[in-house]
Structure formats: structure tokens, C-alpha cells
Amino acid sequence: MENSQLVSITFLAYTIIISIGSINCIDNNNLVTNQSALFVFGDSVFDAGNNNYIDTLSSVRSNYWPYGQTTFKSPTGRVSDGRLIPDFIAEYAWLPLIPPNLQPFNGNSQFAYGVNFASGGAGALVGTFSGLVINLRTQLNNFKKVEEMLRSKLGDAEGKRVISRAVYLFHIGLNDYQYPFTTNSSLFQSISNEKYVDYVVGNMTDVFKEVYNLGGRKFGILNTGPYDCAPASLVIDQTKIRSCFQPVTELINMHNEKLLNGLRRLNHELSGFKYALHDYHTSLSERMNDPSKYGFKEGKKACCGSGPLRGINTCGGRMGLSQSYELCENVTDYLFFDPFHLTEKANRQIAELIWSGPTNITGPYNLKALFELN
């Protein structure tokens, strides 16, 4: 309990300090000019609450208890017990918490520090959970509106400078590979795995290029983690509990290889394009397979859920308010908070690797280096 209170007090103090700094920045154009913003795109790994404000299902929202229990003491829409990776990246960059794009009453000046466009369930393909989420293409369109607003409010030159100095952080693609199997689709009977992955990665690199054409130069990207072996995946086949969901395994591996090659091509083709690619697959696999090395007791069992490994995603009544779920006693023992999403403790560890990890895990730049670039 004392540790939990200390974390909350420390986070509150950080928030107050950053908020005071933000007020100064709003009043002083020079400080705005010299501070790199953070723009976030992606899915539930990064969604800070955008899905709270769209007409969708409870299964792609997390605005209910016990989500948010650790740091915020109430649900925020983040799919974790506390903070997500972008929250920690913002802290390390001395930025305020990056607000969801759809959150009401955001002052325009706050956008100078960045915006979070991510949406739980989103994919790089428009058809992934269509009508229920904000897909990557729509997230890009929302960014374009913010870019226009910044140029209008700050002036064309200053707005362009905010965009060019900003870091653009992405995690997307996993839902594109899971979605066909949640709908019993016959998709892969009519298209090869490789062609499908080409579509996903192609959509991602197209968005990177469009952000580049708008002035963006610094990109942080996570490859796809081993979610074929997450608690939810380990219980899909009830006759083979703890077996990874093999149909997705090949897609994930192919995705990560093609994403790396795509980024290398962009780096060659686009002058000034710089990127930090985090090997999320490796960093998460290491923690799943050897949790005690990283301070966890459970690497493949969720803190919140039901059934074997708490792998059925009923956390907080996600699949219906009448459905029961179990909640662990000590969330810091767990890598996964719910059957698919990490605890705050795990998110912090991953964020640290993205921020200042060595080149074999985040490269050719890390985010700290990107933020320091003029």
C-alpha cells in the first residue's frame, strides 16, 4: 500500500511540475518552438481514451473498473491498470500527458505538445473492425486537421516547425492479423499470407510517407509483439492450453520482417527521414518466457480475466456486465493486466527500452536521440 501511495504521489508531483511548465510554454512562443511534440498513432497498446468518445462496443473500450486502478485511481480508457507506453515516453521527454484527440475541451495550445490519435481495435486496414474503431487512415486525417490548426494558431512558419521537430510514435498492425480469425473469415482461402501482410505493411508505410510529406521527419515504430502467445491466445484451443495460436504466428513474423525492410527503403528514399524501430517482439518475448528476470512472477497469466490463465477477456465485465471475472491481488507480479494488454509496470519497462535502449533492441536511433535532434 505504501509503494502504491508513493507512486501516486510521485506521479501527481510530476503532473503538477509539467503542467506548470506547460502553462509557461503556452504563454511563451520561444518555449513552444524549442520543445519537440509527440504525436501518437495506433491501437489499444497506445489508446489513451479516444474510444470513450465514439459509438462502439464495450469490448473495445476500457472506461470501467478495474482499468486505471493503479495510477489514475479510476478508468481513463487506457487498457491497463495504469499508464501506457506513450505516457512514459512523454514523461521522459518532459512533456505533459499527451491528450486523446477526441477528448473534449482541449485547448488548442495544448496540441503544440502533441496529440494521441490511437484507437483500441484499430488496424492499418480500413476493414479491420470497421465502424467500431478509428482506423489508421482516419487517424492520419485527424492529424492533418491538427496540423492545419497548428499552422493557423501559431503561424505558418511556427506550425511547420512544430511538425518538423515532432516525434511520431506508431503501434499498429496486430488487429489486422487477429481480426479475420475473430470473424471466422475465409479470407486466407482467397489471399496468401504474404500478400495480406504486404497490404498491412504497405498501408503503414504509406501513412509514414504522408506524415513525411506534411513535414514529419522523426518516427518511432514498434514491431508486432508475440501476441500469438498472449494469455488470450493460449486458451483459444481448449484442448491445447498454453499453446500459441499458430495461424497468427506466421503473419506476425512476416510482418516484422517486411516492416523492417520497408523502413530501410524509406530511409534510403526520403531525405532526412529518421526512425527508431523497437523490437517489441523480442522485448515482450523475453519477459513472457523469463518473467522473474524482469521482476514478474507471472509472464503468461493475466491479472484480470477468467478461466485458465485468466485468458478469457471478461476483465471489468468487458463481454457483458453480468459476466464475472477474477482480479489478482498484486498487479506488479504480472506482465499482463488483462489477457492481451500489459500492466503499467511492464509498459514502463518497454518504454525505457524505446527511450534509451541499445541499437540491438531499438535502432538505428532510440527515441531519446530523436527528441534531441534539431
From Swiss-Prot:
One Gene Ontology molecular-function label: lipase activity
Bilayer-spanning residue ranges: none
Positions annotated with a glycan in the UniProt record: 34, 184, 203, 330, 360
UniProt keyword terms in alphabetical order: Ethylene signaling pathway, Glycoprotein, Hydrolase, Lipid degradation, Lipid metabolism, Plant defense, Secreted, Signal
Positions of the catalytic residues: 44, 338, 341
InterPro entries: GDSL, GLIP1-5/GLL25, Lipase_GDSL_AS, SGNH_hydro_sf, SGNH_plant_lipase-like
Keyword Calcium annotated: no
Signal peptide (from-to): 1-25
GO cellular component: extracellular space
Subcellular location: Secreted
Enzyme Commission number(s) from the entry: 3.1.1.-
Expression triggers: By ethylene.
Cited CDD domains: SGNH_plant_lipase_like
Domain of life per record: Eukaryota
Any one GO biological process: induced systemic resistance, ethylene mediated signaling pathway
Gene3D superfamilies in alphabetical order: SGNH hydrolase (3.40.50.1110)
Consequence of gene loss (knockout): In the resistant cv. Columbia (glip1-1 and glip1-2), confers susceptibility to A.brassicicola.
The family this protein is said to belong to: Belongs to the 'GDSL' lipolytic enzyme family.
Physiological role: Confers resistance to the necrotrophic fungus Alternaria brassicicola. Possesses lipase and antimicrobial activities that directly disrupt fungal spore integrity. Triggers systemic resistance, mostly by the ethylene-dependent pathway.
Protein name as catalogued: GDSL esterase/lipase 1
Organism: Arabidopsis thaliana
Organism taxonomic ancestry: Eukaryota, Viridiplantae, Streptophyta, Embryophyta, Tracheophyta
